[in-house]
Amino acid sequence: MKGFSHTLQPYIGCRFGCSYCYVSQSNVHRFYNGGMEWGSYVYPRVGIAERLETELATLHRRDALERAAIFMSSSTDPYQGAERTYRLTRQCLSVFQKYPPGLLVIQTRAPLAARDFDVMAALGKRCLLNLTIETDREDVRRVLTPHCPSIQQRLETARQAREHGITTQLTVSPCLPFSGVEAFGELLLESGDRVIVDSYVAGDGGGGKRTARTAIPGLYARSGWEDWRSQEAALSLYDWLSRRIGNLAGWSREGFTRQARSVTGNVC
């Protein structure tokens, strides 16, 4: 992921199977799917914590650990259901306690993350928790991400994280149809320290071309929603948030990588 020095994937595949997920168009999916649809499989990367410790120890010896910005995860959810069984994410966090990087960003949509708030809090400002909340409408969630936790569950997880002193970013990524700018915006501000807004066109890594090959165009058409390629709603929400919280609101890639660039010194 541009802007970060490393990414970390405790699992291959993701059972949340979001209809818009760009990973379904990636080489990772094509290599590992075995003919299965995106969202129907997950493979635990057993031994990932041991490999992580080796890598972090090397960075430590080279005095490079403070300049490491790690994103967990860009092609899976580290707290999907398999984590209850395999605990790979928890194992990795224990390694990060031993070798804390300059920045660790944890990206999830799962309330299971609350299990590990003790470790995240112990990492202090080195750890950011990103919680995906793309809309405030449950009807939209049920159509586009039916296997994901409810919006209310995720908002409550964000509030609990803040109570534990964990810096929490809500990622409206991608921005899905929502009830209204002010209503959704206020809900986000009540629950997170920062907010990142993204769109299909700005955020799928292909100017919308990847999204065009997913189920999204058909789902939007059948639901009677506006053109999925329009960025008007996402930009309106971002503008409203920017007026309220300034640079604590971020847009697309720049928003995701702002803290990472301050650690790594990378321009992009």
Predicted regions and their residues:
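Conserved Radical SAM active-site core
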Residues: 1-128, 136-139, 151, 163
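Hydrophobic faces of well-ordered beta-strands that scaffold small-molecule active sites
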Residues: 70, 104-106, 129-131, 168-172, ...
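Active-site beta-loop-alpha junctions enriched in small/polar residues
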Residues: 75-77, 109-111, 132-136, 173-175, ...
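A short secondary-structure junction signal
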Residues: 84, 118, 141-144, 173, ...
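A general structural detector for well-ordered alpha-helical segments in enzyme core domains, enriched
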Residues: 88-92, 116, 150-157, 183-188, ...
